[in-house]
Curated annotation (Swiss-Prot):
Ubl conjugation is among the record's keywords: no
Top-level lineage group: Bacteria
Lineage of source species: Bacteria, Pseudomonadati, Pseudomonadota, Gammaproteobacteria, Pseudomonadales
Quaternary assembly: Heteromultimer composed of HisG and HisZ subunits.
InterPro entries: aa-tRNA-synth_II/BPL/LPL, HisRS-like_core, HisRS/HisZ, HisZ
CDD domains, sorted: HisRS-like_core
NCBIfam families registered for this protein in UniProt: hisZ_biosyn_reg, PRK12292.1-1, PRK12292.1-4, PRK12421.1
Organism: Pseudomonas entomophila (strain L48)
Name of the molecule in the record: ATP phosphoribosyltransferase regulatory subunit
GO CC entries: cytoplasm
Length: 395
């Protein structure tokens, strides 16, 4: 390897330098404090574990995004976490085993073998919150509200939200008795809004079902979409109508809480179709091609761990929030330069200053006073009249 190559990082892997690292860490603490104020408890999960545990309940997308290695001790395949949710689901289902609802949150680095999109990070700092044990739209509204509070805390401007419900397509596909291949092809066509393909794939279905599946391409827009859906999907199975009712209840509550939040509905949006079971949502901002925060309902994700529970949650990338947010993160200003001395009184004074939250930097042997500027110090400790005092730094 050439010397120059030793400085290179893999595509999508980045290091964070001061002061940006301090901004990210301060924001992380603030967001976790926000989660705690809503009743969410922090969990810390392993960076790496056996692959079958890591991917349990997850879809194919997560499998493709997971780095895999062989454990030299057991010979078993392991993976680096690419998403916290399967791990948190295991904690809820297998470890905590609470009877009532559980509110859990997390913050930490994840690693992606494949990026979410072109030029996106493969090592985001994922943070999120999850609510287990309640199947009502009230829980969905809670996690969406917490997501919006997180964006408000970091002052991300001009957000708008997309809402959908995978239960609508799933209920129609079941009623049509589609084969697995056709269901997947139709799913792909709906995501691309490929009208001609959708028409071809539904041509042989009963008239009502074909019309309703084709309608999903067009059922996107503002709140009026929900009223239109009640008409165009009026002959749908009961599960589809129940999904529409849930979506309407969530939309009503959000409109009441956030009257200025633009809401966009897309009933053909099937983000996380193989993973989510109900409402899905995502937040976008101008200039960003990908959602900056997303989530939805994923009931029974803990079934493979022996306990099926309703679940809903959201996640986002802390690095992205800090980059896009306008919130002023106040970094500790300046510092105090401590001379290289063995004086016990000086040490006691420095300990007191640090306990008070002051930043004190120790001078190393041979360092001139000018080094204090490089250490971002604006004051110094000087002994006067037999006492150590903090005075302005003299150049």
């Amino acid at each position: 390897m050439a010397t120059v190559d030793r400085w290179l990082l893999p595509d999508g892997i980045e290091e964070v330098l001061p002061p940006e690292a301090a901004r990210i860490e301060i924001a992380r603490r603030q967001v976790l404090d926000l989660f705690q104020s809503w009743g969410y408890e922090l969990v810390v999960t392993p960076h790496i574990e056996y692959l079958e545990s890591l991917l349990t309940g997850a879809g194919q997308d997560l499998d493709q995004r997971t780095f895999k290695v062989v454990d030299p001790q057991s010979g078993r395949l392991m993976g680096f976490r690419a998403d916290f949710t399967p791990q948190v689901a295991r904690i809820d289902a297998h470890t905590l085993r609470r009877e009532g609802p559980s509110r859990l949150c997390y913050a930490g680095s994840v690693l992606h073998a494949q990026p979410r999109a072109l030029s996106t990070s493969r090592s985001p700092i994922q943070l999120g919150a999850e609510l287990y044990g309640d199947a009502s739209p009230t829980s969905d509204v809670e996690v969406i509200s917490l997501m919006l509070a997180t964006l408000q805390l970091t002052d991300v401007p001009d957000v708008h939200m997309d809402l959908g419900h995978v239960g609508i397509y799933r209920g129609l596909a079941r009623a049509a008795n589609l084969s697995g291949d056709v269901e997947q092809q139709l799913f792909d066509a709906l995501q691309r809004k490929a009208v001609d393909e959708v028409q071809t794939l539904t041509a042989d279905l009963p008239k009502d079902l074909g019309n309703m599946l084709r309608a999903l391409v067009e059922l996107c827009g503002g709140r009026e979409v929900l009223a239109e859906a009640r008409v165009r999907l009026g002959r749908a199975p009961a599960s589809v109508l129940a999904a529409l009712d849930d979506l309407l209840a969530i939309a009503d509550r959000l409109a009441s809480r956030y009257p200025d939040l633009p809401l966009y509905f897309d009933l053909g949006e099937l983000r996380g179709y193989h993973y989510h079971t109900g409402v899905v949502f995502a937040v976008f901002v101008p200039g960003e091609g990908q959602s900056i925060a997303q989530g939805g309902r994923y009931d029974d994700i803990g079934a493979d761990f022996g306990r099926a529970r309703p679940a809903t949650g959201f996640s986002t990338d802390l690095k992205t929030l800090v980059t896009l947010g306008r919130a002023e993160v106040v970094l500790p200003a300046g510092g105090i330069w401590m001379p290289d001395s063995s004086d016990a009184a000086l040490w006691q004074h420095v300990c007191q200053l640090r306990n008070e939250g002051q930043r004190v930097v120790q001078a190393l042997p041979g360092q001139p006073l000018s080094a204090a500027l490089e250490a971002d110090c604006d004051r110094q400790l000087i002994q006067q009249d037999g006492r150590w005092q903090v005075l302005p730094l003299t150049h």
